[in-house]
Amino acid sequence: MNALSRLLFLLPAFLTASPYVIDTISFPEDVPVEVGALDFAENGDLYVALRRGDIFVATPQEAPDQFAWRHFASGFHNACGIHIVAPGHLIIGQMAELTEVKDTDKDGIADSYQALSTEFGLSGNYHETMDICSDGNGGLYLAPGTASHNGPTFTTPRGNFADAGRFGRNYASVTWRGWVLHWHPETGITPFSSGYRMHNGIERDPQTGHVWCGDNQGDWRSSSPVYHVREDSFSGHPSSLVWDPRFAGIENPLLLPRRLLDDLWNKPAFRLPRSMMNSCAEPAFLPESFGPFAGQMLIPDQSGDRIVRLMPEMVDGAYQGAATMLIEGEPLHRGNNRLAFDHHGTLYVGQTGRGWGKLSEGLQRVRPTGDFGFEVITCQLSSSGFQLTFTEPLVKATNLRLTRYRYNYGYSYGGDELETKVVTPESVEIDSDQPTILHLTLPEGDLLSDHIYRFDLSGVSSDSKSYRGKLTYTLNRLLRPKAEHQITLTASGDDRYRVEINGDLFTEVRTKGFSNPILYPIHGPSGLAMTRDWPVREDGRPNEQQDHPHHKSLFLGHQGINGTNFWHENREESGIIEHARTIETRSGEDRALLRTFNLWKDSEGTVICTDTRELTFGLTDQGARYIDLELNLHASHGPVTLEEWKDGFLAIRTHPHLRLKPAKGKGV
C-alpha cells in the first residue's frame, strides 16, 4: 500500500471523531473478572465485587494495564450489589444477605463481616440475585430477584416457603422475592414495591430522588421494561403477590383475574424492543462530562454489546419517553452488567456472563471525547406529535416515517409487535429560530396512548452528517389539554384525598374511619353541600333526619355477597370494605383522578373479593361538576355470588333540602 492509499484509508476515521474512547482494564491473570457490582469511594478508589465471591480495590490509573489491584474481601455468595459508606467500609448485596464489610485495623483487608439483614428468603435457585442502591437518607433499596424454572429450589430453603409461589417460569417461592425492599438501620426491611421478574439492577436518580430498575423480557414481559419504582406499586409479574398480605390465601397468583392485574399494573416508563435490548441491567445517570446528555439515564444490556440512553419525561403524572443508543458494538464487550462513574465523569462498565449466549466478562472504561456526534438530545411528546432536539443544526429532514405498535401484557414468554402501522407525519418542520429542533405533526388519530413509536430518521441530516441512530418512544399517556380550570387532588393526612376546583373544595375521598370508603362532603359550584352530614358528623345539621346510619354521603356496598352484608352496619353478618392501596393519582388541568384497590372482608376479616375503582372529577363545558366512577369487582380470592337484594352498589344520601318526600299512598 503506497502512502496516498494509506492516507485515503485513514481519512474517514480522521474526519469523524469518535465520541468515546473505550479501554479494557487489566486484572490479575488468575482472576475471573465476572463483575457483580462496582462503585467508587470518596477517595477515588474503585471497588469491584466479583460474582465468584471476592472484592478487589484499586486506584485508577491513566494506563488501563497499570491498575494495582488489591484483594479486599472474600466469601460472598454471588455479590451483585455494593454501597460504599467510606473507604474500607462497604455494604454488599449478596444472594443470601445484606452484609456490612469493614477494614477496622486499616491494613487494607476487610476483617469485619456483619449480617445487616437476612429477612428475605433464599430458595437455593441460581437466579435469585440482588442489587442495592442508596436511598439518599442512610438506607438502601434492595432488588431481590425471582427464581427460574431452569433450576430447582433446595429442600431446606431459608425463610418462609409458599407453595403458591412455586408456579410459573419465574417464581417467588420464598419471602420477598420479586419485590423492591427498603432497608434502614433503624427499621430493618420494609416491602416497597412488588411485581418484578428479574430486576437485575436498581438505582436512584440523584436529581429527583426517584428510584428506577430494569427488568428482563420473559414471562409477563413482552419486551425489556424499565420501571419508575413507586411505593406500593405493582410492576406486572404476579408471582411476588403471594408475599403481599392483601392476597393471603390465594392458591395461584398466575390465576388472579386479568382485569385485576391490568388495573394494578404500574406500566413501564420504557419498553425496549429486542433490537435495542435483551437483558436490562443496572441503570445509571449521566454526569456533566457527558455534555448535552447530562442527567439522562443509561441502562446496559447484560446479554449484548450495547448501552442504551433513556430520556424520561413526566406526562400526566407518570414517566415515559424516548430511548436511543449511547454505544453499540465493538470495542464494547457483551455482558454489560454494572455501571459507575468516577469523580472525573468517566464511565466504568462491569461485565459478566450468565451461562447462556456468547460469554463475555471484564471491566471497561468509557471516556467522552467532547465530540458527541450527530445525535438526538431529547425526543418529547407534543399535543400533535413529537419535538426532537439534535446536537447539530439541521439542514434537511425528508422521508421521515414512524412505525407504531404495541405489546400484549400476559403470561406468555416475550411477545411480538402487534397492530403494527407505518405512520407518515403530516408535517415535518425544522424550527426557524432554533434549527437543532425538529417538529413532527402526525395525522389526527395517529397519536395513541399505550403504544410504542419507532422512528426512521435516515432522511435527517446536519451540514456534514446523516442521522444513523435508533430511536423509539414509549407513549403511555397523552398530554392533557390546557384548561381554564385547575382540578387538583392531594393527600390530606393518611385518611383522605382532597379534590379542589380552582382552589375551592369539591369533595374529599375518605379512605379510613368508616366501614367503607366514602365521599364527604360534596359541594356544588356555589359551595353548598349536596349530601347529608350525619352520621359523618355526629351532630349533623339542623333538621337533618338521623336514620339509616349506613347512609354516609356517597358510598358503595352490597347487601349480600357470599353471605356477607356490605350495606348495613353493626349486624352479625356485616362486613367491611377496606381501602388497601392507592394505585395512582393524577391531578391538574381539566380533571383529577384517583384509582384505588379495596378489600371486601367478612365479619371475621377474611377477604371475600376485591375491587379496583377509578374516580374522575371534572367540570362540564357548562360549568357543572361531575364525578365519574368505574368499578371492577374481582373474584380474586375464590368464587363470588352476588345475592338478590334490593340494596347494592352506588348510593348517595342527599342534603335535606334536596330530598323528595313521598306522598301517602303514592310514593315519590
Placement of each model-derived feature along the sequence:
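Acidic (Asp/Glu-rich), glycine- and aromatic
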Residues: V509-F514, I518-G524, T620-K666
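Beta-strand-rich N-terminal accessory domains
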Residues: K482-H548
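Sec-dependent signal peptide recognition
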Residues: M1-L10
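Beta-propeller domains with acidic blade repeats across secreted/periplasmic ectodomains
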Residues: A17-G373, I377-T389, K396, V428-S432, ...
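Bacterial Sec-dependent signal peptides at the C-terminal "C-region" and cleavage site
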Residues: F9-P19
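Extended, loop-rich substrate-binding clefts of extracytoplasmic carbohydrate-active enzymes
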Residues: D547-G623
